[in-house]
Amino acid sequence: RDHIYPAATVVGTQGKELKIYFIASKAPGLGVENPQQVSAFLYPPEYSKDPPLFSRALIHRNDTQEIIFVSGTASILGHSTLHEGDVLKQLEVCVDNIRRLIKTAANENQCSAINLADMTQLKVYVKNPGDFTSVRNHLKRIIGGISTTCFIQADLCRDNLLVEIEALAIQATS
């Protein structure tokens, strides 16, 4: 792979407005991929003529901190959706995938040893508004509290995905 792609999440909304936010830096980041998932930029053409160009996570370091941006992470292993129709099982796979990304970041990129409890922000995208309460309660059972967790109703990149999580961790460097 010749490029380092950004961490990214793309979801649909009910409104007519396009909303984009991004963080830019002059320094390149370090891309992180989940060893249990096909990298999105290598997806087979059955998903899209042009594969999405993003890293599963990106590490950015400066003199005072290390930031891990985790792209929207869903219930996908290899390139296949798992647990169609079961939002709580999909949530568990999302969390497991984020744990793998954190472990890979630590092992392959000498990133600070962190765990899910160290995440400073989670955005949880839920397809069906009726699932908000069960997703919130199950997530709390799985990982406990995260300082900032936002639950957002959104259309996800595949019809059979019901939940997706984007995460952020910031660690001071010594």
Could you describe each region identified by the protein language model?
Residues R1-S174:
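N-terminal presequence-like segments and the immediate start of the first folded domain
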